Amino acid sequence: MPSIQESKLAFIGGGNMASAIIGGLLSKGVNKQNICVSEPWDVNREKIAALGVRTTTSNVEAGGDADLVIIAVKPQVTKGVCQELGGAWSPRATLPVVVSIAAGITLDSLKEWLTTSDSRTAHTVRVMPNTPALVGEGASGAFASTDITSDEKELVNAMLGSVSKATEWVDREDLLDVVTGLSGSGPAYFFAMVEHLVASATALGLPEDQATRLATQTCLGAGKMMVESSDSPSQLRKNVTSPNGTTYAALQTFESLNFKEIVNKSVQAATARSAELGNPSTKP
């Protein structure tokens, strides 16, 4: 299996997440001419072309001879894209590795749709990235078919590592729903927290722009402390909580309003909804 620098990479879909990954790959030294992107929309295709990579409107042209194919299209068009690619790969001696970031599409469905005319199926990986990947600070969950090799897994890790600081491989596909509830939807939880912190401080008289800068940097700084410290988040919380101090007063309010249960139910709701979206019988 060639390295990420030597591999031919195809992106089917050139939206924001694909653009972020491509930018990350280029920053890691991947040759622009080794990347081809299929994108039907002129505006998106022009933005991608500005990065110096090859572009096309043909999925087969982009992915026909690629080593790694990233499917980054909307779930409702994923089946057609996969069937088109599977048909084009029938003459190939070796099939590519396929990574899907299409939400709610199961591995079994992907492998069925990607099956070639001679009944072979590409080794396939499902990935749940999150939006901080757009600034190179993503967190991704991944689940692979049992036939994936260690070299293929390393290739996927290298691709995801260009935009994700954390990539976690789960042992069961249903755990991707939990990943969705945790890190996939997670950025919105922090946005909401900062939103409400700013509103509270503004109501107490602090100018909104100052409150926004302070709250945003506090969120960023706390995250960096968790990344760089050997202490658990629980211990870090205890470290900054003096008995009967200001932080203690705030956290006591959290406890009295059952903040823990709010978080539990929120993650459970997102996880359950992710599972529903992955079940064709429950999709709206």
Spans of features found by a protein language model:
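NAD(P)+-binding Rossmann beta1-loop-alpha1 motif at the extreme N-terminus of oxidoreductases
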Residues: 1-65, 137-138, 162, 202-204
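NAD(P)-dependent Rossmann-like dehydrogenase/reductase catalytic/cofactor-binding core
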Residues: 2-6, 216-284
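Small-residue helix-packing motif on alpha-helices
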Residues: 35, 62, 78, 207-215, ...
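Rossmann-like NAD(P)(H) cofactor-binding subdomain of soluble oxidoreductases
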Residues: 51, 59-142
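Internal alpha-helical scaffold of NAD(P)-dependent oxidoreductase catalytic cores
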Residues: 112-123, 139-178, 191-228, 273
